[in-house]
Design a protein with these regions (language model features):
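Positively charged, solvent-exposed patches that mediate nucleic-acid binding
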Residues: 1-116
Length: 116
């Protein structure tokens, strides 16, 4: 699990990130990125899977867990904790990502981050 300081929590933070509209897409994962106004705030991340993707919460939550874990592992591998970029990121899972394995989702997350 990501430490609390690295998570987007409020609806206003999610909306502000969506408004900036810097985005990239790969394999059923879309990434929206925004720049934080305050420079003392580290990069914060949120994960979203809407009811349009699947009506069952179990499926949506599983996809969110896979997205979270793949992002966390990429941070650990690349030693990006405490990076000097002041971003807010929102990963949005789509229907295409539902049946994929962890490795496929991890590659999709990696590609979206590289495109950014």
């Amino acid at each position: 699990m990501l430490p609390k300081q690295y998570r987007l929590k409020k609806r206003t933070a999610f909306k502000a990130t969506y408004k900036v509209r810097h985005s990239s897409h790969s394999g059923g994962v879309t990434l929206f990125a925004g720049i934080e106004k305050k420079e003392d705030i580290p990069t914060r991340v949120g994960f979203v899977v809407s009811k349009k993707v699947h009506k069952r919460a179990v499926k949506r939550n599983r996809l969110k867990r896979l997205l979270r874990e793949s992002y966390r592992q990429l941070l650990k591998e690349n030693n990006l904790y405490g990076s000097d970029k002041f971003l807010s990121l929102v990963f949005v899972g789509s229907e295409n990502a539902l049946g994929k394995s962890f490795d496929e989702i991890k590659n999709s997350v990696k590609k979206t981050l590289e495109k950014l």
